[in-house]
């Protein structure tokens, strides 16, 4: 009886926490422009443009600017939004010859916050049928529970710390990242 009461109490506490799902947003292209508009709600949107300066690609999100580290680096990104929160999470793929993970940014009406780097690549087949370190962006899902963002990976295999000293191949569902109080943290 005690365990049953404890389970009911635990379930009640979990269901009281606010949970918001962040969905992947599709861009509305602006004619004759390099800009894309992502609508968060009927009144809120973010504008993203990619252009080069000094041989480096720049991602401009409203007033927030992020410049790539290398001259040949491509910018690949995904935008996730939640209309109730009036916020967007932008994930920017870090790439050399293969994916090295992604950087996370939270964008709201006040600007952008760099949350940190997520050193995870998808270990999937390339067009040629070989296994390789590919972008994790198509396989990420994001929810927000209370004041914590949870990023999970919907792919069978991931590479943690690609090309690093601690590189390891894991089941994609066995790890997730949380962002809370200014800290991005790996959870196993």
Per-range role (PLM):
Residues 52-69, 105-122, 175-187:
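Surface-exposed loop/turn elements that mediate protein-protein interactions on large endomembrane-trafficking
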Residues 55-57, 97-105, 159-173:
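Structural motif
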Residues 66-101:
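Mid-chain, structured segments of secreted extracytoplasmic proteins
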Residues 72-79, 124-140:
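Repeated scaffold domains used in trafficking and secretory/extracellular systems
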